[in-house]
């Protein structure tokens, strides 16, 4: 959502942050790229200002920032953290032509009793499942699906089979929705 062409203008960077933009920056023809890997966090973060419908201003967001080490490398300021926004993730997958999707930082969510996952928005009184043109907070309210959290320490787990069932369910839900 920070891309100069496909992001939430004016809260964007000055360059293209998409897979196509990477091709341009590297001087590689897009038809030479076989696979586009999409890597996302198990929760959502945003640097700086701009719309962030799933931002959590309470303890959950603070916990994600602390456990996930979500602090700027130069300023040391905490990044804005919130629940996973599948609407934004689907948009990123679509715009980038993602062929394989990888989740990271699932361990940051260990210890939460419940998790919220945004599956759509209430936009001006209507339910939608796409990013609206005007995504300002006063126009958009996230629609959350609540899921069971997990308590397990994921350190040292190296296979899918070792993961707690609640995390597997979380992953499978994302796979189904995206």
Annotate each language-model stretch with its function.
Residues 1-178:
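Non-transmembrane, aqueous-exposed alpha-helical and coiled segments at domain scale
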